[in-house]
């Protein structure tokens, strides 16, 4: 810092005292001719500092002003004049200062007397050592509770360190300009490092939100601490991330973290018993699900009551309903990514839990200093629980799932910042949906069996420069059986698939403002299929039917095999501009699809099968951008192209079309996020998606050979989703989500032939209407969810969830006639998807009590679904003559009491 130093020099060049000559003694008794004598010099007792003139500071030179000062007999300054100038600015400053001087007066002949003195006022510009200034400070809070954390060490590599105070605040003075590695650590925190840059003339103020470590019993602390320096990771532009602890406490989930996805914006409410994910108007199979980079076929067990992965292995779950980056593909809809947590290096940990739905357990322990393992599992018994409290076979009216799942995770440390994880998963589901009838021959059933297993290995390496490498090979097996008996010949589809994949990614900083990810994403499958029964079962999206309707009398059988392979390289770069306020993330993915089917035409006795191979290479550009206009207000937008290979079950030469190619979609979205407080945020997103080349059933009653399915359908979805969220902080968390959406389809009519039936009514209502959009079978106009949970203290917590969803579209039955071939009533349909199932409305509540000891903790809870006992319709059903309409309803009030103990 530059400071002005003012000096002054007193020059007693002359003294001007009154002079007189006396011929005789004056009145004072002085003899004539006495000469006055200065007996005491004036002494400066108050010095007034003159400011160094601002106009002269740039020149930086010294200056002196010589003045004559008149001092009276009391020591005051009565006048001052410039004798030697240094310039107007210096002269004015000196005159103003000396007029405020005061002196111990001079004495002449030992008496106070007025005098005039010559005074030199010196101006000297002196450079002093600058005062240390704060140019880097910040505050540290708990990522979950948002409370400040005291005692956290913040270290700047090669400079020094500071410790946060009770307010979580820290500060550094005179940190050298440029980039610095910052390490933040504490005894109960996960150590993190980041990179910050200090610029000239600017103070850097930051806020860090740190994640607490898992609690470790006393005496079991780990000496292993791994710190890496990594560039910031960009999330998808539109995504919602839920931490495991927050998800576990959501009412209606019974402590299952992954079930919270059903309550997020953009997700339609699935019908009970389906467990389907319908995101932004896409079909359930169009949304991709990954666990640590491993693709799995489903997120929930049959019925949607439980997820297929133990919540205690989950670190976080992220839902991107659309517009996601180039790292992922092969889906037209949303993206769900689940990250499993790191295993604890010391101590034996685990939990056991049970409620009326199922029981679950997990054990986690180290094998040695570098290897640790966790094993988890779950088994349902809901049917047995319900049989205790009801006098009737509830399974005849409500679909009751039967399931189990198991997981194993092993982590081995190869060295600092280098490890291998092995993850194994398995799940099995059975679900039966029944429509009873006094006549056993008329009982209608829908049965499904799903098995899948996965084993994956993840090699992770993070380098000192912040770059990282991730390699994830995986393999697995899927087995699916569906069986329908709605009168006539039963229909069955048996699918067996061996699947495999490999993901490789390198991520690093390529410049001061860019982070680039380069990767390879491989997936393939070898599948076999066996199908018998009606050519119209199971029903497809767009089919006009009602539950329990006897299938058409066209039956057939087929067995076939398929293989699929896609090896997709991708690149994505995050470009930060304007001090990281603007991020532009361009990316591109090259997706080659190779598909083979074993039969191009149906099997004919004595003729060898002729297979077919289809190949296409798709270019998928993606772009997203975020702009943080002010600290609390940001904007975002994204678009991208997406492709999806045909389902293997659709490549039958009898029931499908072996020449099917890829389906296509385009996503466009934009929105904003406003941070109301540190804990409360509001987000709104407008979205639009367009899909083409969708696979639909051939509209013709007599399709050409191997063309039971065609690929000229179109789809579109558009709407707005909003999310008002209070993050887990202190005692409360919750959110309000709402989605207003319309999802439509346009069917292919190019191969339509005249429909025939005795009355002609069916043809009029079932025929395709060229160019006309209709409602998607899973369309829901309004979906709203309100979730809240409050810690009452003393270990008690209460929460509630309210859900509202528009019912799915259905095609009305406007009449019936007796078919001549089967002597059964056949329905006459109205306009396709012109009515809806009544709206779904449900209130759930949860109350829990937690206990904590030094050796473990426990929780007991009561989670009540459908508190009001509302009979929510799930499907429309008719009697045998289609004159009376009813509904299959969901579960009544379901109180789920449970307990959990962990150590």
Q: What is the predicted function of each stretch?
A:
Residues 188-190, 197-209, 225-325, 335, ...:
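Periplasmic N-terminal accessory/gating domains of Gram-negative outer-membrane beta-barrel systems
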Residues 417-462, 469, 477-499, 540, ...:
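Flexible loop and strand-edge segments within Gram-negative outer membrane beta-barrel domains
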């Amino acid at each position: 810092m530059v400071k002005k130093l003012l000096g002054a020099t007193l020059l007693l060049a002359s003294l001007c005292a009154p002079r007189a000559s006396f011929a005789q003694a004056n009145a004072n008794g002085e003899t004539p001719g006495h000469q006055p004598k200065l007996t005491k010099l004036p002494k400066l007792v108050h010095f007034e500092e003159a400011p160094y003139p601002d106009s002269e500071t740039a020149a930086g030179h010294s200056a002196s002003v010589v003045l004559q000062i008149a001092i009276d007999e009391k020591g005051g300054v009565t006048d001052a004049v410039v004798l030697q100038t240094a310039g107007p600015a210096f002269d004015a400053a000196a005159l103003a200062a000396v007029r405020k001087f005061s002196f111990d007066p001079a004495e002449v002949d030992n008496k106070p007397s007025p005098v005039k003195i010559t005074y030199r006022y010196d101006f000297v510009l002196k450079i002093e050592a600058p005062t240390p200034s704060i140019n880097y400070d910040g505050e540290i809070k708990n990522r979950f509770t948002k409370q400040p954390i005291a005692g956290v060490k913040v270290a700047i590599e090669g400079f020094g360190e500071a410790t946060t105070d009770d307010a979580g605040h820290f500060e550094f003075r005179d940190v050298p300009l440029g980039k610095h590695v910052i390490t933040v650590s504490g005894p109960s925190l996960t150590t993190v490092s980041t990179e910050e840059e200090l610029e000239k003339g600017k103070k850097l103020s930051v806020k860090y939100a740190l994640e607490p470590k898992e609690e470790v019993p006393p005496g079991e602390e780990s000496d292993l601490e791994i710190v890496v320096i990594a560039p910031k990771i960009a999330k998808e532009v539109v995504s919602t991330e839920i931490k495991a602890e927050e998800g576990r406490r959501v009412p209606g989930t019974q402590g299952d973290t992954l079930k919270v996805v059903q309550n997020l914006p953009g997700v339609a409410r699935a019908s009970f018993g389906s467990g389907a994910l319908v995101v932004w108007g896409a079909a359930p199979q169009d949304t991709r699900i990954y666990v640590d980079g491993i693709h799995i076929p489903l997120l929930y067990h049959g019925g949607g009551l439980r997820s297929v992965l133990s919540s205690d292995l989950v670190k976080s779950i992220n839902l991107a309903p659309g517009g996601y980056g180039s790292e992922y593909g092969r889906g037209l809809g949303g993206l769900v990514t689940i990250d499993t947590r790191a295993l604890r290096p010391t101590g034996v940990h685990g939990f056991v839990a049970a409620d009326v739905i199922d029981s679950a357990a997990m054990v986690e322990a180290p094998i040695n200093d570098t290897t640790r393992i966790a094993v988890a599992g779950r088994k349902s018994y809901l049917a047995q629980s319900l049989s205790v409290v009801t006098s009737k076979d509830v399974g005849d009216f409500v679909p009751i799932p039967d399931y189990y799942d198991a997981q194993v995770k092993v982590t081995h440390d190869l060295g600092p910042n280098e490890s291998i994880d092995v993850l194994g998963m398995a799940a099995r589901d059975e679900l039966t949906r029944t429509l009873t009838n006094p006549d056993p021959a008329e009982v209608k059933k829908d049965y499904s069996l799903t098995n899948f297993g996965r084993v994956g290995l993840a090699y992770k390496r993070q380098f000192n420069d912040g770059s990282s490498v991730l390699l994830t090979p995986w393999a697995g097996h899927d087995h699916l059986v569906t069986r329908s008996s709605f009168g006539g010949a039963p229909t069955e589809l048996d699918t067996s698939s061996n699947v495999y994949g490999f993901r490789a990614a390198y991520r690093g900083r390529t410049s001061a403002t860019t982070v680039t990810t380069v990767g390879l994403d491989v997936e393939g499958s070898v599948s076999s299929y066996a199908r018998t029964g009606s050519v119209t079962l199971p029903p497809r999206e767009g089919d006009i039917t009602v539950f329990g309707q006897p299938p058409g009398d066209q039956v057939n059988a087929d067995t076939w095999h398929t293989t699929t392979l896609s090896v997709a390289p991708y690149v994505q770069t995050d470009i930060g501009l304007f001090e990281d306020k603007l991020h532009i993330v361009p990316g591109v993915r090259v997706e080659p699809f190779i598909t083979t089917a074993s039969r191009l035409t149906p099997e004919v006795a004595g003729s060898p099968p002729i297979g077919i191979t289809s190949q296409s290479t798709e270019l998928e550009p993606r772009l997203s951008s975020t702009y943080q206009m002010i600290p609390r207000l940001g904007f975002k937008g994204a678009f991208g192209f997406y492709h999806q290979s045909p389902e293997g079950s659709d490549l039958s030469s009898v029931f499908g079309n072996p020449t099917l190619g890829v389906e296509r979609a385009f996503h466009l979205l934009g929105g904003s996020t406003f941070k109301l407080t540190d804990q409360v945020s509001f987000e709104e997103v407008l979205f639009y998606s367009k899909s083409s080349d969708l696979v639909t059933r051939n509209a013709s009653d007599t399709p050409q050979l191997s063309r039971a399915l065609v690929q000229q359908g179109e789809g579109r979805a558009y709407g707005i989703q909003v999310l008002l969220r209070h993050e887990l902080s202190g005692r409360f968390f919750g959110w309000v989500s709402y989605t207003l959406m319309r999802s439509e389809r346009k069917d292919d009519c190019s191969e339509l032939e005249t429909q025939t039936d005795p009355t002609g009514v069916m043809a009029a209502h079932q025929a395709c209407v060229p160019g006309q959009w209709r409602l998607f079978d899973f369309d829901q106009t309004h979906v709203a969810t309100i979730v809240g949970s409050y810690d009452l203290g003393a270990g008690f917590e209460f929460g509630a969830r309210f859900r509202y969803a528009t019912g799915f579209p259905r095609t009305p039955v406007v009449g019936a006639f007796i078919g001549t071939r089967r002597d059964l009533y056949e329905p006459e349909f109205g306009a396709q998807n012109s009515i809806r199932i009544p709206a779904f409305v449900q209130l759930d509540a949860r109350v829990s009590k937690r206990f904590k000891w030094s050796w473990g903790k426990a929780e007991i809870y009561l989670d009540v679904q459908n508190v009001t006992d509302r009979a929510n319709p799930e499907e429309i059903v008719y009697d045998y003559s289609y004159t009376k309409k009813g509904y299959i309803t969901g579960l009544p009030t379901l109180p789920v009491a449970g307990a959990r103990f962990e150590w």
